[in-house]
């Protein structure tokens, strides 16, 4: 299992993802923000008292942060590659970083 890092870093990452999700509305007014803040404050000092395993809540928060980040990246990739309909061969080649060869003029190519 990879190292979890600090709980504060995980908390800030969750808040960042909430800001991305909400866009225009204030993320501090959402129920998700209030719940996350409450859980981090409740388990701030006595983390092992409420958890069966050491750092269980921190692990769950890190896993949820990974999920939110992955969903956001998936949506960005989906918008970039699947939301444009039919594309020309030049556009498709450009998506993967290639260029089509130039067609020479003259007999046989017209």
From Swiss-Prot:
GO terms for cellular component: mitochondrion. It is found in: Mitochondrion. One of its GO terms (biological process) is mitochondrial proton-transporting ATP synthase complex assembly. Its main location: mitochondrion. Keywords: Mitochondrion. Residues 88-110 are annotated as: Disordered. Residues 94-104 have a biased composition (Low complexity). InterPro entries: FMC1_homologue. The keyword rRNA processing does not apply. It comes from the Eukaryota. Plays a role in the assembly/stability of the mitochondrial membrane ATP synthase (F(1)F(0) ATP synthase or Complex V). Belongs to the FMC1 family. This is Protein FMC1 homolog.
